[in-house]
Amino acid sequence: MTRTVDEIKYETPSSWEHKSLDVAEDGRRLAPHSDTARPKGRIRRSMTACHTCRKLKTRCDLDPRGHACRRCLSLRIDCKLPETTDRFQDSAAMWPDATSAIPSIEERLTSLERCMREMTGMMRQMLDHSPGFANASVPHLTKSIITDENASMEGSPSSPFLPKPVRLIQDLQSDFFGEAETSPVDSPLSSDGNAKGAIDSKLSLKLLQTFVDHFGACVSIYNLSDIHNDMKAPDSLLYNTACLLASRYVPGIPTSTVHAIYLQVRHAVVNILWEKPPLKYETLQALALLCLWPATAQKEPPMDSWLLSGISINHAIIALDFLNYAPSEVMVDNETAAQLRLWNTYCLTQLHFAVGNARPFHIQQRYLDHCPRILEHPAATLEDARVVAEIQLYLMTLRLQSNSSRMRLADLDYEEIERWKREWAHLFSGESSTLELSLWFCQTLLHRTAMRLQPRSDRLASEVLQTSRLIISRFLQIRYSTALSLVDQVYFIVGYAALNLCDFNLMDPLIEQVQMFLLHLSPNEDHIAYRFSCMVAEFKRRCGSAECNDPSSTVKGSPLSSYGDSRKMSMGQAPFMPPLMDGMIEGYGFEQLMPEVMPSSFPDGILNGMPVTGLAAYRSATL
């Protein structure tokens, strides 16, 4: 190899010879005193390196922003490097743009995280606009709702591909009964004794006691003394709500009076929700009751519990002090336990109608973490445990529905739900327990969601049919006095199960049994049970009429059932069915019923004379 030395300039020999040199004792010549003894073209390299670079025999470059070399910084080890001015100048000269060109590790990680968030957001937008993956963008949970289990549930979007049982039932009622119109408010709870339909003090006391016995526990009202005198004023929302709910147990109250109370409550709610926060505690109690029983008077448009609970939750976050602290920082005393019970009611109602309407769920995880704390209180009840268990169940349902890959697998059993069943199995027993109804309802929704991706799955269709029969069979065993105080969500669960039976097996005897049970259960024609009974009967009649008129379009032309008519049982396939009264399930005894408050028959026009508009008009695609 030829070495190029063109750029190296040496001084003239004459000058070189006249340089003074140091001579060692052994005669060897040492370096001259002057720097000119070194050739000017040689690169001036730093002879100082840290211990690591010297050991690895690698280049040691100092980071201008720190006191360590780049290799030690990247390896995250201590850099044993003497701090010298020459060293810093050498590195700075060789890396003049190091500050701007090579960021630190923390800056790199921050940049990568930002890019990942942007990419994730773009992917979600793409999935939202893709019909095949639309239900991948539904709420995530427990840590909040989005596709990943550790993502946030805040502002979770809804999906048009999810079943909407509550919306479906409300649409069917509007179709069968017509749109309701709001009437002017005329309060019967007036201090004026001459007012039309006014409730006197003796009757109001009876209503309050009935309310305490059947409804008060869910908002920590166990005695009449828990309702203070200022809460018993005619303009008190809690007082009006208590009288409204208790009226179903007092058949002597005229329907017009109950209707007027309902209108006044609606009017008061509209005004209160716009009041400056924080709201009074008794007002929050009344709002929680109305979230649980929004459809008290069915002649009026029902209050939207999803919207009502959402606004009430915002007021509760401001009014309830314990929500301002971490769960571990809160001592669960009697007052906090009552507030936790109220908060859990709001969370559960928001979940009920977020799932039932396929709407977003907005409660942040840090607020949801407070829900199980009520079980730490020594006076916690089984009902408190049921509410906590149901909150967890609906959160899991939202998470599973939002996971399109899990829905495509079309599992009949989900590991999360099986764990939940083992944890809360002790709450399934008991005549008044409705936890199993919620479990079967959530399983039905998961199977219905999976059927959108597996439209011809016989396994899923069979599972929906079986689960719907379990719901109705269990509901028919509930006693009359208990059934009247059930929250409206239970009636939506039972109504949806009955519609599923009409969809899969029109000849199932449970359809007529639950229809009659709802009819005899209702204290008046405004009660939700009465309207649901009429709805099931009319839905079944239209299904049967449409199939008889056009057998070829039985299910194939229905947007509801895209899995074909093979799931339907014909008259020839149906097993022998005993008469209705002989086939009643044990526990459904007519001695429980109150003849004086039973409507004698369906109103004219509900079941007769209504035109059959075709299967697609009333069998909603969202069932």
Swiss-Prot record:
Keywords: DNA-binding, Metal-binding, Nucleus, Transcription, Transcription regulation, Zinc. GO terms for biological process: positive regulation of DNA-templated transcription; regulation of protein catabolic process. SMART domains: GAL4. SUPFAM superfamilies: Zn2/Cys6 DNA-binding domain (SSF57701). GO terms for molecular function: DNA-binding transcription factor activity, RNA polymerase II-specific; transcription cis-regulatory region binding; zinc ion binding. Transcription factor required for protein utilization and degradation. Regulates transcription of major secreted proteases. This is Transcriptional activator of proteases prtT.
